[in-house]
Amino acid sequence: MSRCPVKGFLFEMVKTSSNVLFTQLKRAAIVALCLFVFCEWLIYYLVIYQCSWPELHSEGREGRFDPLRIMLLTDTHLLGPKHGHWFDKLRREWQMERAFQTAVAHFKPDVVFLLGDLFDEGLYSNDEEWDFYVQRFHKMFDHSENTEFHVVVGNHDIGFHPEAARDSHLFERFSSVFDSPSVKLINIKRNIFVLVNSIALQGDDCSMCSEAMSQLHAVADKLNCYRRSKKEIFEDIVKQDRTFCELPKDSPPPILIQHFPLYRETEMSCTGVDAPPPDLKQITNREKWEVVSKEMSNTLLTLIRPRLVLSGHTHHGCYLVHEDGTPEMTIPSFSWRNRNNPSFVLSVITPERYALSKCFIPRESTVIAVYIIAGLAFVLVNFRPTYRYLKTRRTCRQITLDCCVR
């Protein structure tokens, strides 16, 4: 039997082509790994490091106060066991964890405030599911002991008023885990914060609402102690309700933090890249659902007399000034699940002044676009070598067949 004269040559061609294909596959694996690292880790540093603490312009005696640096975020909506696809849960929670950990490591805030709707299914979770929920939350939003962490409750954590009033256990377990009563007064570096449970501001006789109003008036008494007459203070001393004013006489007006925004008829006054779209701006807000009722909003402004109001709930950004001159910033959602361009707020505060700045985290559309563009570019660059390998294999197979036939 005669030997095929091109057998050795064909073998070398196939071997060379195989090496080329192996090299391409190895290169593809390296590119895929680098792309994954960039989109899932490095991009957060690249975007968040472009943000910075706002500059607090000093006036007069401003330098005598040590500025307080706070970070604010809201509406994280961790998915629960009943709703949402597992990949959706994995993707969006990884995004929030990376964004939060990157921001906290870089900015090192003194305090972090999360303005409600920590969970998406708090209302529907039994105690076992709730415990697992809380463990996931603490893992995602882990922070150093040098950073204080405070939260307020949202409607997805315990339900709107009808559900929360019907089952008091929902708010009780949230309050016990996060040390978050319906009304809480915090004094940090002489800056006063009042944290309020918006769900309890219904003005009815439910136990949660009654307790909230009692706590609200107690906090208002502390805030307005020095505004009261000497006769009123003396009467309290006699009753042993109070022996002295707890806050310093020169304490600044507080900052009010809650989940629901104060009453506003629509979102027409909201501006910015994260403001509601035009079709949503015109919709009338429902009291006790989208915003605090008009009556209770006036009560809060009268009792607390805040210098600033911070809220969440709408998933959109908004800054406005109420009729009495009180400014309010509504912070957008921190989750890709609620918007394409999530953000958080950095604030520098002293008893006399404050400054706010908004920091955006990577857009979900940007990350997806990077994956698609990089993938297509790699395929196009490597298409010709791969095509040549496949063509060589086909040619060699045909030549070998012809040689053997002869």
Please report, for each region that a protein language model flagged, where it lies by residue.
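Loop/turn elements at helix/coil->beta-strand transitions in domains of secreted/extracellular proteins
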Residues: E40, D66-L68, K108-D110, S144-F149, ...
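Active-site-proximal beta-strand elements of phosphoester/diester hydrolases
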Residues: P67-H83, R190-D204, P254-H259, L308, ...
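N-terminal active-site segment of His-dependent metallophosphoesterases
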Residues: S2-D131, R136
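Active-site neighborhood of phospho(di)ester-bond hydrolases with catalytic His/Asp-centered motifs
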Residues: L72-T74, V112-D117, E148-N155, V196-N197, ...
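Short acidic, glycine-rich surface-loop motifs adjacent to enzyme active sites
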Residues: K249-E267
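Binuclear metal-dependent phosphoesterase catalytic core
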Residues: S2-C4, F9-F11, L21-A28, A32-H57, ...
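Solvent-exposed loop/turn segments at secondary-structure junctions
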Residues: T76-L79, L118-E121, N155-G159, I199-G203, ...
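Extended active-site neighborhood of metal-dependent phosphoesterases/phosphodiesterases
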Residues: Q50-G60, L123-K249, D279-T284, T302, ...
